[in-house]
Amino acid sequence: MKIKYFFIPLFSSAILFSACSSIQSDLRNLIKETTGKDFDVSKLIKTSEGRKNLINSLKKSYESKPDETASLLLIAWKQSAEMGEIGFDDIKEGGIYTRDNDPFKLEQKVEYFNMEYKILVMF
C-alpha cells in the first residue's frame, strides 16, 4: 500500500514533462496497450481534465504492467529534471512543516505540482 504513495508524485510530475518525443511515444503506446485509449500526450497535458485522464490511465497501466510503467515514468522524470523543466525554482519555499510535533516526520506541500511529499528525515 505504501508503494502507492511513492508513485503518486511520479504520476503527477510525469504529466508535466515535455521531454523527448520517444518518451511521449513510449508512454502513448503503454497507455494504448493497457487501456485501449489512444491519447496525444502533448495535447493531453495542457488541460486539467486531460491530466486527470492521463493519471487515471497511468494508474490502470501500473496495475497491469508495474515494472514497465515505473521505468518509463522514472526515465521521463529524469529527463525533465535534466532539461530544467522540473526545478527547485518551481517549488515554493517555506512549505515545510512538522506534523504531530515529531521533528523526524516532515511534510512538504508543493503547490506547483498540487501534491504533498512525506519525508522521513534520519539524522
Curated annotation (Swiss-Prot):
Residues 1-19 form the signal peptide. Coiled coil: none annotated. A lipid is attached at C20 (S-diacylglycerol cysteine). PROSITE patterns: PROKAR_LIPOPROTEIN. It comes from the Bacteria. It is a lipid-anchor. GO terms for cellular component: plasma membrane. Pfam families: Lipoprotein_3 (PF00938). It is found in: Cell membrane. A lipid is attached at C20 (N-palmitoyl cysteine). Keywords: Cell membrane, Lipoprotein, Membrane, Palmitate, Signal. Belongs to the MG439/MG440 family. This is Uncharacterized lipoprotein MPN_054. It comes from Mycoplasma pneumoniae (strain ATCC 29342 / M129 / Subtype 1).
